[in-house]
């Protein structure tokens, strides 16, 4: 459950280490984002010579949450951290690698690139 001011780890090699959610996209009254939702983020910590710089604003998709994802069979998949993958304006990932597991809920037409790059899909 991600809301404004939530800090997330970055699960790709775009150069950012940590980002902060500045808006949950999808309507003015929308408060929370879950796995698979697109949010607007600001880069808070970045490595030198990365593709992104501190202070820049990007779209990102949430790939892991501590709140977890409830499946239809009743199971709950939780993670140790909140993580996102940074996207460009065409909603394609900026990085070329994904770190850590992602959930099957990302398996829509929009995020198949993230699924194919991920080392593990739960």
Curated annotation (Swiss-Prot):
Pfam families the UniProt entry points to: Ribosomal_L14 (PF00238)
GO biological process entries: translation
CDD domains: Ribosomal_uL14
A single MF term (Gene Ontology): structural constituent of ribosome
Keywords linked to the UniProt accession: Ribonucleoprotein, Ribosomal protein, RNA-binding, rRNA-binding
Gene Ontology CC entries for this record: cytosolic large ribosomal subunit
Highest taxon above the source species: Bacteria
Subunit structure: Part of the 50S ribosomal subunit. Forms a cluster with proteins L3 and L19. In the 70S ribosome, L14 and L19 interact and together make contacts with the 16S rRNA in bridges B5 and B8.
Family membership noted in the UniProt record: Belongs to the universal ribosomal protein uL14 family.
Reported function: Binds to 23S rRNA. Forms part of two intersubunit bridges in the 70S ribosome.
UniProt protein name: Large ribosomal subunit protein uL14
UniProt source species: Methylococcus capsulatus (strain ATCC 33009 / NCIMB 11132 / Bath)
């Amino acid at each position: 459950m991600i809301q404004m001011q939530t800090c997330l780890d970055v699960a790709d090699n775009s150069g950012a280490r940590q980002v902060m959610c500045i808006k949950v996209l999808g309507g003015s009254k929308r408060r929370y984002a879950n796995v698979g939702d697109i949010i607007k983020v600001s880069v808070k910590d970045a490595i030198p010579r990365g593709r992104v710089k501190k202070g820049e604003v990007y779209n990102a998709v949430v790939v892991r949450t501590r709140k977890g994802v409830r499946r239809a069979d009743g199971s709950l998949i939780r993670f140790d951290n909140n993580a996102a993958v940074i996207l460009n304006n065409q909603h394609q990932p900026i990085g070329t690698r994904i770190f850590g597991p992602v959930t099957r809920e990302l398996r829509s037409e929009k995020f198949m690139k993230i699924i194919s790059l991920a080392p593990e899909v739960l």
